[in-house]
């Protein structure tokens, strides 16, 4: 008798991806974040769908509709806070997932890595547009400031910004189109995730040692399914603790004030997960320069496969590179902190130094240290 799981055209694909998939026997908890990101995406799409049933994308009613969701819809407050804090969890998992890739040299899988960077950019775009939808003060001014950055593009900048706005300022047209894009993007992300997995399964997973693990593979189910379930339980516990005890911990109080084009908040800042990039943007006094630095701070990830000069794939046996990696992590924490501070001394200088250090470590120090370690191997 043939097994349906292995012969059915559709179930066969699922089987090869999540059941009979040969996986390295030594992958650590750092490999859990892929499945956690899948869970986050599912949570966001589901909660987002239910929110969209009650939300209205009109400047006059958007803020009121969010209030209505929280006050009058059954468990609307829960759905809204799951969606808002689910985004934070999404980014925590994303940053850890990317960090894992950098540490263990997973970026040598070119296609998987590049699709991953595109995914990161798509999730960031989705989160930005979602933040605009409640139409609070920070939503409005965040949208104004960030979309205005495109005006730094020579020649077409101003036209481009007005085209995105659908008018001469952030208004009804902007809100409506942002809602449309915010709705469609998660489905595009889901499609990209499938491509990401397709490319990953062409090569198989990397592992902490960075060595080829073809000689020692185990089936994904039950070993890694049970491990993923543990990760999922921990993630849900963390998320629900955040939602039920301090749902506004990561939000901005300014967003509880309805959008007012006539009054600018004292400190315009994005959600915490964009602060590192925002700090890099602000650390350059020139508008176009700042925008380029902002874009490059994310796209620089695509250069990692080219900057990999070490003879070893993983950093597991490279103490000098490990040291530089953790300095880079500390630098990103510093940038995140600076992004939330006002533009004044000493924060400006700290931000500029942290931005310079960020690019220097990635473009110069890590490759140099890799070469030094190659030399040390010969001793």
Swiss-Prot record:
Subcellular localization, as worded in the UniProt entry: Mitochondrion inner membrane
GO annotation, cellular component aspect: mitochondrial inner membrane; respiratory chain complex III
Binding site for heme b b562: 83, 182
Amino-acid positions noted as binding heme b b566 in the UniProt annotation, renumbered to this chain: 97, 196
Positions that bind a ubiquinone: 201
Comment on bound cofactor: Binds 2 heme b groups non-covalently.
One Pfam assignment: Cytochrom_B_C
InterPro entries, A to Z: Cyt_b/b6_C, Cyt_b/b6_C_sf, Cyt_b/b6_N, Cytb/b6-like_sf, Cytochrome_b, Cytochrome_b_C_euk/bac, Cytochrome_b_N_euk/bac, Di-haem_cyt_TM
Molecular function terms, GO-annotated: metal ion binding; ubiquinol-cytochrome-c reductase activity
GO biological process: mitochondrial electron transport, ubiquinol to cytochrome c
Further comment: Heme 1 (or BL or b562) is low-potential and absorbs at about 562 nm, and heme 2 (or BH or b566) is high-potential and absorbs at about 566 nm.
UniProt subunit comment: The cytochrome bc1 complex contains 11 subunits: 3 respiratory subunits (MT-CYB, CYC1 and UQCRFS1), 2 core proteins (UQCRC1 and UQCRC2) and 6 low-molecular weight proteins (UQCRH/QCR6, UQCRB/QCR7, UQCRQ/QCR8, UQCR10/QCR9, UQCR11/QCR10 and a cleavage product of UQCRFS1). This cytochrome bc1 complex then forms a dimer.
Protein family membership: Belongs to the cytochrome b family.
Name of the protein in question: Cytochrome b
Organism expressing this protein natively: Xerospermophilus perotensis
